[in-house]
Amino acid sequence: MKVIFLADVKGKGKKGEVKEVPTGYAQNFLIKKNLAKEATAQAIGELRGKQKSEEKAHAELVAEAQAIQAKLAEEATLVEFTEKVGPDGRTFGSITSKKIAEELEKQFGIKLDKRNIKVDSPIRSVGLIDVPVKIYQDITGVINLRVKEG
């Protein structure tokens, strides 16, 4: 019996796959537990339509991420912070990934999740700093920061 897997089943198939499985296994286990459904012509057509819409959405997200990557790569995209500095040259407050995300949106209108900004430890020094950021899956970029004395 041909079935369309609705979820990953270890050793049998992944979500969205159409596979031939024993009839008893399909009816008594996979279909009863909503892990698969029978692969009728209509169900296969729905699956293909769903896969096309997912591919289109993925392509749009990739294009959007590449646009953000290009904007971050421009020389003009320099996120500036003005912080109070102590006598030892370190800032009183620290610059975290949350602050960077907020300033990036405020100064350039670029929305990034703070969890994707890779700051090893909060920034407490003055000067130019490059911060790596994961924009979408394999697409990464670098945020240029300038921390000034204020």
From Swiss-Prot:
One of its GO terms (molecular function) is rRNA binding. GO terms for biological process: translation. Gene3D superfamilies: Ribosomal protein L9, C-terminal domain, Ribosomal protein L9, N-terminal domain. One of its GO terms (cellular component) is ribonucleoprotein complex. This is Large ribosomal subunit protein bL9. Keywords: Ribonucleoprotein, Ribosomal protein, RNA-binding, rRNA-binding. NCBIfam families: L9. Binds to the 23S rRNA. Belongs to the bacterial ribosomal protein bL9 family. The keyword Plastid does not apply. PROSITE patterns: RIBOSOMAL_L9. InterPro entries: Ribosomal_bL9 (IPR000244), Ribosomal_bL9/RNase_H1_N (IPR009027), Ribosomal_bL9_bac/chp (IPR020594), Ribosomal_bL9_C (IPR020069), Ribosomal_bL9_C_sf (IPR036791), Ribosomal_bL9_N (IPR020070), Ribosomal_bL9_N_sf (IPR036935).
